Amino acid sequence: DIYLYIFENDKVNVEEMWKNIENIRKQDVEAEQSSVQKYWIKYVKEHINIELKEENSDYNKKFNQIYKRSILLFPLLTNKETGGVAAAVEVDENLTQCGRYGYCWPRDAVFITRAFDKLKMNKETEKFYKVFCKNTQSRNGMWEQRFYTDGRLAPCWGYQIDETAGVVYGVYEHYKVTKDKKFLKDMLKMCENAVKFLCIYMDNILGLHDDSDIVKNEIEKTYHTENRNKLPVSYDLWEM
């Protein structure tokens, strides 16, 4: 059986809906399945960037399988229109019965784009930085905690500095792979604004300046900045 999901059916009349269903029913399902299969086999071959192991052991077979499945996974995470990259695939559209990772955290996406580069998915990496990051950067240079992959701001519960720092790091890591100076120039203004924000943010945390910005009040509620230097060096990744 084939089940059809009718999306936004309130925007078409019933007759038009049935015409669409009839057109779908006329399609050769086996031919469509074969076409899809050929597409993804070709896709995997195009992105294999290592010499796969000879499958003479269970370990090697498993290694090759995981590698190929990883290639198939990444397109499911990526929004082709915006370049946004979700942290994980979610099947629960309401995000109530799941891990709630179907969002784009800039920090997480940066590390995923590093995997993109290792799989010859450089275009996907560049779209993330050139389109998604540019469109979601705040006026003060920061990136918020998380977004929907279409670029809309998602619910947040607190600022995490590595969301911003990670993007600057990721831009340079991608440049080291491609050596594309034009990409670096395109990213320069965005990264300069991000670094300026990071300097202000850290000055506030360390108590080096009294000038307040949009995150200072939140920082002061969390940290005793005057005793900051006396605290042991211990932090979680998202507090970097």
Q: Model-predicted segments: where are they?
A:
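Generic secondary-structure boundary/loop-capping signal
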Residues: 82, 140, 144, 158, ...
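Extended hydrophobic/Leu-rich segments
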Residues: 2-7, 17, 162, 215, ...
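Active-site-adjacent structural elements in folded domains
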Residues: 87, 91-100, 150-155, 213-218, ...
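Aromatic-rich carbohydrate-recognition surfaces in CAZymes
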Residues: 25, 32, 36, 101-208, ...
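Acidic/polar, glycine-enriched structural segments that form the non-catalytic walls/loops
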Residues: 1-100, 181-183
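C-terminal ends of transmembrane alpha-helices
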Residues: 77, 81-82, 200-211, 223-231
